Design a protein with these regions (language model features):
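Gly/Ser/Thr-rich helix-start
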Residues: 52-53, 186
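Structured mid-to-C-terminal alpha-helical surface segments
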Residues: 1-32, 37-47, 58, 75-270
Protein backbone atom coordinates (compact mmCIF):
# COMPACT_ATOMS: atom_id res chain seq x y z
CA UNK A 1 0.00 0.00 0.00
CA UNK A 2 1.25 3.46 -0.84
CA UNK A 3 2.06 5.87 1.96
CA UNK A 4 0.64 9.22 0.85
CA UNK A 5 2.33 11.26 3.57
CA UNK A 6 5.73 9.82 2.71
CA UNK A 7 5.23 10.38 -1.02
CA UNK A 8 4.08 13.99 -0.53
CA UNK A 9 7.22 14.80 1.43
CA UNK A 10 9.29 14.36 -1.71
CA UNK A 11 7.58 17.45 -3.19
CA UNK A 12 8.04 21.11 -2.16
CA UNK A 13 5.31 22.72 -0.01
CA UNK A 14 3.80 24.77 -2.84
CA UNK A 15 3.04 21.53 -4.69
CA UNK A 16 2.15 19.08 -1.92
CA UNK A 17 -0.06 21.54 -0.04
CA UNK A 18 -2.31 22.10 -3.05
CA UNK A 19 -5.22 19.62 -2.82
CA UNK A 20 -5.61 19.60 -6.60
CA UNK A 21 -2.09 18.22 -6.99
CA UNK A 22 -2.36 15.25 -4.65
CA UNK A 23 -3.65 12.68 -7.14
CA UNK A 24 -0.99 13.76 -9.65
CA UNK A 25 1.67 13.34 -6.98
CA UNK A 26 0.46 9.76 -6.50
CA UNK A 27 0.38 9.20 -10.25
CA UNK A 28 3.92 10.49 -10.66
CA UNK A 29 5.16 8.19 -7.92
CA UNK A 30 3.58 5.16 -9.62
CA UNK A 31 5.05 6.27 -12.95
CA UNK A 32 8.46 6.27 -11.29
CA UNK A 33 7.82 2.81 -9.87
CA UNK A 34 7.03 1.51 -13.35
CA UNK A 35 10.04 3.21 -14.93
CA UNK A 36 12.33 1.87 -12.23
CA UNK A 37 11.04 -1.64 -12.91
CA UNK A 38 11.41 -1.30 -16.68
CA UNK A 39 14.92 0.14 -16.31
CA UNK A 40 16.11 -3.25 -15.06
CA UNK A 41 14.01 -5.35 -17.43
CA UNK A 42 15.00 -6.92 -20.74
CA UNK A 43 12.69 -4.51 -22.56
CA UNK A 44 14.76 -1.43 -21.77
CA UNK A 45 16.98 -2.26 -24.76
CA UNK A 46 13.99 -1.91 -27.10
CA UNK A 47 12.25 1.20 -25.76
CA UNK A 48 13.10 4.88 -25.45
CA UNK A 49 11.34 7.19 -22.99
CA UNK A 50 9.56 10.07 -24.77
CA UNK A 51 6.57 12.38 -24.31
CA UNK A 52 5.38 14.70 -21.58
CA UNK A 53 6.47 12.48 -18.72
CA UNK A 54 10.00 12.58 -20.09
CA UNK A 55 9.79 16.38 -19.98
CA UNK A 56 8.65 16.19 -16.38
CA UNK A 57 11.01 13.54 -14.96
CA UNK A 58 14.08 14.07 -17.15
CA UNK A 59 13.93 17.70 -18.26
CA UNK A 60 12.18 19.16 -15.20
CA UNK A 61 9.22 20.97 -16.77
CA UNK A 62 6.85 22.55 -14.23
CA UNK A 63 3.79 20.44 -14.94
CA UNK A 64 2.57 16.94 -14.23
CA UNK A 65 2.10 14.40 -16.99
CA UNK A 66 -0.46 11.63 -17.22
CA UNK A 67 0.95 8.88 -19.46
CA UNK A 68 4.11 6.89 -20.07
CA UNK A 69 5.12 7.03 -23.74
CA UNK A 70 7.88 5.07 -25.43
CA UNK A 71 9.43 4.92 -28.86
CA UNK A 72 10.13 1.27 -29.61
CA UNK A 73 12.33 -0.62 -32.04
CA UNK A 74 12.24 -4.36 -32.81
CA UNK A 75 9.29 -4.56 -30.46
CA UNK A 76 6.17 -6.52 -31.40
CA UNK A 77 2.73 -7.15 -29.93
CA UNK A 78 3.95 -10.20 -28.04
CA UNK A 79 6.74 -8.15 -26.44
CA UNK A 80 4.26 -5.49 -25.37
CA UNK A 81 1.85 -8.07 -23.95
CA UNK A 82 4.65 -9.67 -21.94
CA UNK A 83 5.92 -6.30 -20.73
CA UNK A 84 2.40 -5.27 -19.76
CA UNK A 85 1.84 -8.40 -17.72
CA UNK A 86 5.20 -8.01 -15.99
CA UNK A 87 4.36 -4.42 -15.04
CA UNK A 88 0.97 -5.49 -13.65
CA UNK A 89 2.53 -8.31 -11.66
CA UNK A 90 5.18 -5.96 -10.29
CA UNK A 91 2.57 -3.45 -9.13
CA UNK A 92 0.43 -6.14 -7.54
CA UNK A 93 3.41 -7.62 -5.71
CA UNK A 94 4.19 -4.11 -4.49
CA UNK A 95 0.83 -4.11 -2.70
CA UNK A 96 -1.07 -2.05 -5.26
CA UNK A 97 -4.32 -3.28 -6.74
CA UNK A 98 -3.89 -2.85 -10.48
CA UNK A 99 -5.99 -4.08 -13.38
CA UNK A 100 -5.61 -3.93 -17.15
CA UNK A 101 -8.70 -3.04 -19.11
CA UNK A 102 -7.65 -2.69 -22.69
CA UNK A 103 -8.84 -4.05 -26.00
CA UNK A 104 -6.41 -3.37 -28.79
CA UNK A 105 -8.05 -1.66 -31.75
CA UNK A 106 -7.20 -2.72 -35.27
CA UNK A 107 -7.07 0.98 -36.19
CA UNK A 108 -4.53 1.76 -33.47
CA UNK A 109 -0.95 1.94 -34.73
CA UNK A 110 0.52 1.95 -31.22
CA UNK A 111 0.58 -0.64 -28.45
CA UNK A 112 -1.49 0.69 -25.57
CA UNK A 113 -2.20 -0.44 -22.01
CA UNK A 114 -4.53 1.26 -19.56
CA UNK A 115 -3.80 0.32 -15.95
CA UNK A 116 -6.66 1.03 -13.58
CA UNK A 117 -6.21 1.32 -9.82
CA UNK A 118 -9.64 0.53 -8.31
CA UNK A 119 -10.51 2.42 -5.13
CA UNK A 120 -6.95 3.75 -4.76
CA UNK A 121 -7.95 7.40 -4.41
CA UNK A 122 -10.65 6.41 -1.92
CA UNK A 123 -8.23 4.29 0.12
CA UNK A 124 -5.73 7.17 0.23
CA UNK A 125 -8.40 9.59 1.38
CA UNK A 126 -8.25 11.58 -1.86
CA UNK A 127 -11.81 10.85 -2.96
CA UNK A 128 -15.14 10.29 -1.27
CA UNK A 129 -16.12 7.91 -4.06
CA UNK A 130 -14.84 4.34 -4.27
CA UNK A 131 -15.62 4.29 -7.97
CA UNK A 132 -13.58 7.36 -8.94
CA UNK A 133 -11.41 6.42 -11.89
CA UNK A 134 -7.64 6.54 -11.58
CA UNK A 135 -5.44 5.18 -14.34
CA UNK A 136 -2.06 5.33 -16.03
CA UNK A 137 -1.73 4.71 -19.74
CA UNK A 138 1.38 3.11 -21.22
CA UNK A 139 1.84 3.55 -24.95
CA UNK A 140 4.61 2.25 -27.19
CA UNK A 141 4.94 3.11 -30.85
CA UNK A 142 7.76 2.94 -33.36
CA UNK A 143 8.31 6.56 -34.38
CA UNK A 144 9.93 5.36 -37.60
CA UNK A 145 12.98 7.57 -37.22
CA UNK A 146 16.53 6.38 -36.55
CA UNK A 147 18.64 8.01 -33.85
CA UNK A 148 21.06 6.93 -31.16
CA UNK A 149 19.39 6.95 -27.73
CA UNK A 150 21.17 8.59 -24.82
CA UNK A 151 21.12 7.44 -21.22
CA UNK A 152 19.44 9.94 -18.91
CA UNK A 153 19.51 9.86 -15.13
CA UNK A 154 16.13 10.01 -13.42
CA UNK A 155 16.36 10.93 -9.76
CA UNK A 156 13.10 11.66 -7.98
CA UNK A 157 11.00 10.54 -5.00
CA UNK A 158 13.75 8.24 -3.77
CA UNK A 159 14.20 6.56 -7.15
CA UNK A 160 17.49 6.65 -9.03
CA UNK A 161 17.83 5.06 -12.44
CA UNK A 162 19.21 5.40 -15.94
CA UNK A 163 16.85 5.18 -18.90
CA UNK A 164 17.27 5.53 -22.68
CA UNK A 165 15.91 8.81 -24.09
CA UNK A 166 16.13 10.57 -27.47
CA UNK A 167 18.65 13.37 -28.04
CA UNK A 168 17.18 16.75 -27.13
CA UNK A 169 16.78 17.85 -30.74
CA UNK A 170 14.77 14.72 -31.59
CA UNK A 171 12.60 15.11 -28.49
CA UNK A 172 11.94 18.72 -29.48
CA UNK A 173 11.04 17.70 -33.04
CA UNK A 174 8.68 15.01 -31.72
CA UNK A 175 6.85 17.59 -29.64
CA UNK A 176 6.62 20.07 -32.51
CA UNK A 177 5.28 17.35 -34.78
CA UNK A 178 2.67 16.48 -32.15
CA UNK A 179 1.71 20.16 -31.88
CA UNK A 180 1.25 20.46 -35.63
CA UNK A 181 -0.79 17.25 -35.77
CA UNK A 182 -3.13 17.69 -32.80
CA UNK A 183 -2.54 21.17 -31.29
CA UNK A 184 -3.25 20.36 -27.65
CA UNK A 185 -2.70 23.16 -25.15
CA UNK A 186 0.08 21.26 -23.41
CA UNK A 187 1.88 20.89 -26.76
CA UNK A 188 2.23 24.68 -27.06
CA UNK A 189 3.47 24.90 -23.47
CA UNK A 190 5.96 22.07 -23.95
CA UNK A 191 7.17 23.51 -27.25
CA UNK A 192 8.01 26.84 -25.61
CA UNK A 193 9.92 24.95 -22.93
CA UNK A 194 11.92 22.86 -25.40
CA UNK A 195 12.60 25.59 -27.97
CA UNK A 196 14.20 27.72 -25.26
CA UNK A 197 16.76 24.93 -24.76
CA UNK A 198 17.46 23.29 -28.09
CA UNK A 199 16.85 23.40 -31.81
CA UNK A 200 14.60 20.74 -33.35
CA UNK A 201 15.89 17.93 -35.52
CA UNK A 202 14.92 18.97 -39.03
CA UNK A 203 15.45 15.49 -40.46
CA UNK A 204 12.63 14.31 -38.19
CA UNK A 205 10.44 17.29 -39.10
CA UNK A 206 11.12 16.77 -42.80
CA UNK A 207 10.06 13.15 -42.56
CA UNK A 208 6.96 13.76 -40.45
CA UNK A 209 5.79 17.24 -41.48
CA UNK A 210 7.68 18.20 -44.64
CA UNK A 211 9.48 21.00 -42.77
CA UNK A 212 13.10 21.54 -43.82
CA UNK A 213 14.25 24.66 -41.98
CA UNK A 214 13.43 27.41 -39.50
CA UNK A 215 11.54 29.56 -42.00
CA UNK A 216 9.21 26.71 -42.91
CA UNK A 217 8.78 25.77 -39.25
CA UNK A 218 7.77 29.28 -38.21
CA UNK A 219 5.32 29.52 -41.12
CA UNK A 220 3.73 26.18 -40.24
CA UNK A 221 3.46 27.07 -36.56
CA UNK A 222 1.81 30.42 -37.32
CA UNK A 223 -0.58 28.71 -39.73
CA UNK A 224 -1.53 26.23 -37.00
CA UNK A 225 -2.00 28.94 -34.37
CA UNK A 226 -4.38 30.86 -36.62
CA UNK A 227 -6.71 27.85 -36.69
CA UNK A 228 -7.02 27.36 -32.92
CA UNK A 229 -8.36 29.27 -29.94
CA UNK A 230 -5.39 29.50 -27.60
CA UNK A 231 -7.55 30.79 -24.75
CA UNK A 232 -9.60 27.61 -24.97
CA UNK A 233 -6.46 25.50 -25.35
CA UNK A 234 -4.94 27.07 -22.25
CA UNK A 235 -7.73 25.58 -20.17
CA UNK A 236 -7.23 21.98 -21.26
CA UNK A 237 -3.96 21.53 -19.37
CA UNK A 238 -4.10 24.05 -16.51
CA UNK A 239 -4.90 21.24 -14.06
CA UNK A 240 -1.43 19.80 -14.75
CA UNK A 241 0.51 22.99 -14.00
CA UNK A 242 2.23 23.62 -10.68
CA UNK A 243 1.13 27.24 -11.08
CA UNK A 244 -2.10 27.56 -13.07
CA UNK A 245 -1.33 31.15 -14.02
CA UNK A 246 1.43 29.85 -16.28
CA UNK A 247 -1.20 28.59 -18.70
CA UNK A 248 -1.36 32.14 -20.07
CA UNK A 249 2.13 31.77 -21.51
CA UNK A 250 0.73 30.05 -24.57
CA UNK A 251 -1.56 33.01 -25.33
CA UNK A 252 1.48 34.84 -26.68
CA UNK A 253 2.78 31.87 -28.66
CA UNK A 254 2.14 33.53 -32.03
CA UNK A 255 3.90 36.77 -31.07
CA UNK A 256 6.72 34.77 -29.56
CA UNK A 257 7.29 32.89 -32.80
CA UNK A 258 6.94 35.98 -35.00
CA UNK A 259 9.07 38.39 -32.96
CA UNK A 260 11.80 36.08 -31.78
CA UNK A 261 14.57 34.39 -33.67
CA UNK A 262 16.62 31.26 -33.31
CA UNK A 263 20.23 31.79 -32.35
CA UNK A 264 22.21 28.59 -32.58
CA UNK A 265 18.88 26.90 -33.12
CA UNK A 266 17.27 28.04 -29.88
CA UNK A 267 14.50 30.60 -29.58
CA UNK A 268 15.83 33.84 -28.09
CA UNK A 269 14.31 37.29 -27.70
CA UNK A 270 15.32 39.86 -30.30
Amino acid sequence: MLNLEQIQNYFPPQIRENPAHKKYIVKEYIQLMILSFLATSKFVKKITFIGGTNLRLVKGIDRFSEDLDFDCKNFNAEDFAEMSQMVLTFLQRSGIRAEAREKQSEKLTAFRLRIYFPELLFDLGLSAYKEERFLIKIESQNQGFKYTPQMATISSCGFFMSFPVPPDDVLCAMKLSALLSRAKGRDFYDALFLLSQTKPNYDFLTQKQGIHNLTELKAKLIETIEKVDLLHKSKDFEHLLFNRENKDKILNFSEFIKKNELRNGKITCT
